[in-house]
Regions:
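Sec-dependent N-terminal signal peptides
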Residues: 10-26
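C-terminal region of N-terminal signal peptides and the immediate post-cleavage residues
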Residues: 23-46
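N-terminal secretory signal peptides that target proteins for export/translocation
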Residues: 1-9
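Beta-alpha junction/loop-to-helix N-cap segments that form part of ligand/metal-binding clefts
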Residues: 12, 87-94, 105-176, 242-249
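N-terminal extracellular/periplasmic Venus flytrap/periplasmic-binding protein-like
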Residues: 38-133
Length: 458
């Protein structure tokens, strides 16, 4: 979804606590990454801010793959069974199942019930799982695979349409038969958060450290982020390329320290715990640490609490903070449905990614009607959507389009600060212009042809 999307080798096994939203000064204290929803989940098929997307109907026989008289088979890609980080993206099938149960209770898509096919690539089986989906599934919705590049030609060849949870590699970002609800492309990136930190830490960003796992699917978006940071005033003095799986972060932390890095976007795009511990052990104190949105969870909060010598730790996000769910009816509905249909499952931003994809898909599929439910129809309706924010779950996007027709990302972002007692919305750092978001065309960085060529060569 985010055009700088990373491998998300991080999952917290901690149960998510009830959250309280406390307004004080310029920040909103979030005691957890989830909230108790106070609204009663509707069984009418109406989603707040999106409208009626599920309802009874005639269904009917169809010659379209994956579409039956009373059912629609949908693939949900993930990497949950991998042995490097077990449980990776397990939220995607969990959220998909919860959404399907909610939608089916309201009558389904014009009378057809959604059937979820869990397509678990376990990191290294993207091609095999896509091949399996090509046999029986109508479309792929609300999922993603960290190493997605091998899946692209297979999916395109069989015409498996996709409304993705997220994409990583350039090949996947630009793929056909796909709508990305986040508007990702390869020649631009929403990066206003780098600029926000440039204003707050003008000296520190002149010695920045970044990095990415040594595989094209991750190097490409992170190199894109490097170019964007430099366009926003950062000077990158060290860019590390560790292997995808790192057991000991001490040597990498020491290299950042030796290079005098004072503004840090870590090469660790997985679990922050060992990286934070390595920083504490080394006595490394840059001016701040900036993390991607995938770190917005209780484990990161615990890491900060367990390592009190860490500098300020920030998270950039384009998703409504789950702990503020009560402030946004669409997010509150998501949390309510997860509590009802996926009891005990932790909720994090992956659930939001999945949800906004499912909401777009259901809205488009319902618009097609029972007799015209085809991949082309669904994608055309999704691609024609304007002012999309999934009812407020994600930062707003003016218009969507097919992924191979130059979509544009949202110009909006928000900043969170990780503190020992909670993750707080940092209003002062965000400088919001619209709701909680900082929305400005200048937040979107356009890459040069030379930069794009360098990324494509990785």
């Amino acid at each position: 979804m985010f055009c700088k999307r990373l491998i998300q080798l991080r999952k917290s096994a901690l149960p998510l606590a009830m959250a309280a939203v406390i307004f004080a000064g310029t920040s909103i204290a979030l005691s957890s990454t989830t909230a108790a929803a106070t609204a009663v989940s509707s069984s009418s098929g109406v989603w707040p801010g999106v409208g009626k997307i599920c309802e009874p109907g005639p269904g009917g026989a169809s010659s379209v793959r994956g579409v039956g008289d009373k059912t629609i088979n949908i693939a949900v890609f993930n990497d949950a069974s991998n042995t490097i980080t077990p449980g990776l993206e397990v939220e995607f099938p969990e959220q998909a199942t919860a959404f399907a149960d909610w939608c089916n209770a309201a009558g389904g898509i014009d009378g057809r019930k959604i059937v979820i096919d869990n397509r678990d690539a376990a990191l290294f089986n993207a091609a095999q799982q896509t091949t399996a989906a090509c046999q029986i599934d109508f479309m792929a919705v609300g999922g993603g695979m960290a190493l997605d590049q091998p899946a692209v030609p297979i999916r395109e060849k069989c015409g498996l349409g996709q409304i993705t949870g997220y994409v990583v590699s350039n090949a996947s970002v630009l793929a056909s038969d796909q709508v990305d609800p986040g508007g990702g492309n390869t020649d631009s990136i929403t990066a206003g958060y780098f600029g926000a930190l440039t204003k707050a830490y003008p000296k520190a960003v002149k010695a920045a450290g970044m990095g990415a796992g040594d595989t094209p699917s991750v190097l490409q978006p992170e190199t894109k982020a490097e170019f964007a940071a430099e366009a926003q005033g950062w000077k990158v003095v060290d860019f590390l390329e560790p292997p995808v799986s790192v057991e000991n972060w001490a040597p990498y932390v020491e290299q950042y320290q030796q290079k005098g890095v004072t503004a840090l976007w870590p090469a660790d795009d997985s679990n922050f715990t060992p990286f934070a511990q390595a920083m504490t052990t080394a006595g490394y104190h840059p001016a701040f640490v900036l993390l991607g949105t995938q770190f917005d969870n209780t484990q990161t909060q615990k890491d900060v609490a367990d390592n009190p010598s860490l500098p300020p730790v920030y998270i950039e996000t384009g998703w409504w903070p789950l702990a503020q769910a009560s402030q946004n009816p669409s997010t509150e509905e998501l949390v309510t449905i997860m509590h009802k249909y996926a009891k005990g499952d932790p909720i994090d931003f992956d659930d939001e990614e999945g949800a906004e994809s499912w909401l777009l898909w259901a809205k488009a599929a319902s618009a097609c009607g029972a007799s015209n439910l085809t991949v082309t129809c669904v994608l055309n309706h999704a691609a024609a959507t304007t002012n999309w924010d999934a009812g407020g779950i994600q930062a707003p996007i003016a218009s969507l389009t097919l992924s191979n027709e130059n979509p544009q990302p949202s110009p909006c972002f928000a900043m969170l600060k990780v503190e020992a007692k909670g993750i707080v919305y940092d209003k002062a750092l965000t400088h919001p212009t619209q709701s909680i978001w900082n929305c400005n065309p200048k937040n979107v960085i356009q890459l040069t042809a030379a930069q794009q060529a360098e990324i494509n060569a990785l």
